[in-house]
Amino acid sequence: MTLHRQIRRTALTLYKHNKQRGRQLSEESRRFFRKRKMTMKKRVKYLHICLTAVLGLTLLAGCGQTEKVPEVRETVTPLTSYVTEEEWEAADMGQEENNAAVAAVMKKAANKDDITIACIGGSITQGTISNGTADKEVGFKKSYVELFSRWWTDTFPETKINVINAGIGATDSYLGVHRVDEDVLSYNPDLVLVEFSVNDAGSNRARINYDNLVRKILLADNHPAVMLLFMGQTNGSNAQTSHALVGFQYGLPMISYCNVIQKMMDDGQYTAKELSGDTTHPSALGHAITGELLWKYLNSVYENCNSYPEPAVFDKPAFTNEKYLHATILPAEDVKVNEPFTVTCSSLGLEYRRTIDGNGGQFGVYVDGEYVGSINTDFSGGWGNYAAAEEIFSADETKEHVVEIKEMEGYEGKSCEILGILISELD
């Protein structure tokens, strides 16, 4: 059928539809037709001319492009098929209206503009894969970050996708909120995925840390999209409940791996040993399941991304407080035991190395001459050396303080390596 025949048929259909459904023409329109003594045939012809003119103007407005952008886009098929629809429903904790910011990143990538995606978290994000008993059957032995990145490169093969992996083992959102500026936001990411649900505690202090981390990302100058990923141990331990409260407050997409593996184990689909070789870190199977969940979410947004409006500028109030919005890490090369140093802050923390060689010990921390806490650099019998971070001092105002780290009695001569001074200042 030619275009003009389609237009003519449309005109006739519209006229008959109005007449049959009792949707009468307005009095003004009837007078217009009567004055010109238009028969039904002439009226259809008139509508045909009008529709042709409208179409012409539409084509001119579209710079001559007659091909309409499809409402539903084709999506890439997930690399695996471990997750059922029922399990996916358990994983997707966000609301439909929360996807506009992620859709905007997809639209940018579809236009072949370079995009940057970043993931910040602990060892799971860093790429640790434990040995599960079913891993021999897993075809894609990749970390979830690699699988997450693969969706973007497969979906937009002609777009440059920059990937920032800011995962550091044995760290939580307290260190995360202090390092996010340098490790993530300095790259001006379009999308940031946050994963700290295994390493964070469920305490109110931990919730404040996580809230400030997420809020700091959302308030960045380039307004990146944010996704929250809730990993979990096979024994069910994680901070999902606390973290989800932050996600609901800010209306963010939330994907729960924890919900899915608990359902899988309850249904007898997989055992704990298949999902993790050490209870904490996902096996290759666990990472594959996580990657599939992320692909399902991204596909669900992408196939209808044209329907999402432009994301609103983030302006929601803080869920807890804004204690760490100005958090950062100061270098500590010159910090020595028993030698005071000066720092201006409202809160103070220390990042220090814990070692398994037996040379670590207990050290007291003093602020303005008063004892405020201690750090323990000894990790004898542990799984390995690592960088610990903890808050030592907090106040309601920003001011200059004199800080000193002292050997405690019985630990003289023990090693104490300070890696960073974690500070924040209140407005």
Give, region by region, the residue ranges found by the protein language model.
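Short, Lys/Arg-enriched N-terminal segments with co-localized hydrophobic residues
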Residues: 21-39
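Conserved catalytic region of serine esterases and O-acyltransferases that act on ester linkages
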Residues: 72-86, 90, 288-427
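Serine-esterase "nucleophile elbow" of acetyl-processing enzymes
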Residues: 77-166, 179-188, 349-358, 362-366, ...
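Catalytic His-Asp segment of secreted/periplasmic serine-dependent ester chemistry enzymes
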Residues: 88, 92-94, 233-320
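Active-site segments of SGNH/GDSL-like serine hydrolases
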Residues: 195, 199, 209-245
